[in-house]
Amino acid sequence: MFTHYILNKNKFPVPCSDNVEWSNWMQENDRVVKRDYIGDILISTVFLGIDHSWGGCTPALFETMTFSKDGSPWDRTIMGRYNFWDEAIDGHDKAVQEISSYIGGQ
């Protein structure tokens, strides 16, 4: 079972058993999937490179989190974890919609 992954040229996760190769890839490549600001809230979706599924069938390798300086309920909130790049984009967009609706409803 692999815990470390890198992305191939098509942004598909592939297992990486060489820790040096993995570390170099993580340092040399842009891991940001999407990043948006809504007011002071940052919505960030990134490739983690490490399986966060806790033993799930498919590795959870991408994560959307929010960050806020104003102490809002969105500060350091994990909005979702995903298995693939396209799922991460969809999850990011849903997080943006959710936060936009929340802020617009205040």
Q: What is each residue range found by the language model?
A:
Residues 83-102:
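A short, charged, amphipathic alpha-helix used as a generic interaction element across diverse proteins
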Residues 1-62:
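Short N-terminal "domain-start" leader segments
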Residues 1, 48-78, 94, 101:
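Short aromatic-glycine-(Arg/Gly/Cys) micro-motifs in beta-strand/loop hairpins
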Residues 11-16, 76-83:
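Short, exposed beta-strand "edge-strand" segments with a Pro/Gly-rich flavor and a Y/T-containing core
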Residues 9, 69, 86:
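Short, ordered coil/turn segments that flank beta-strands lining enzyme active or ligand-binding pockets
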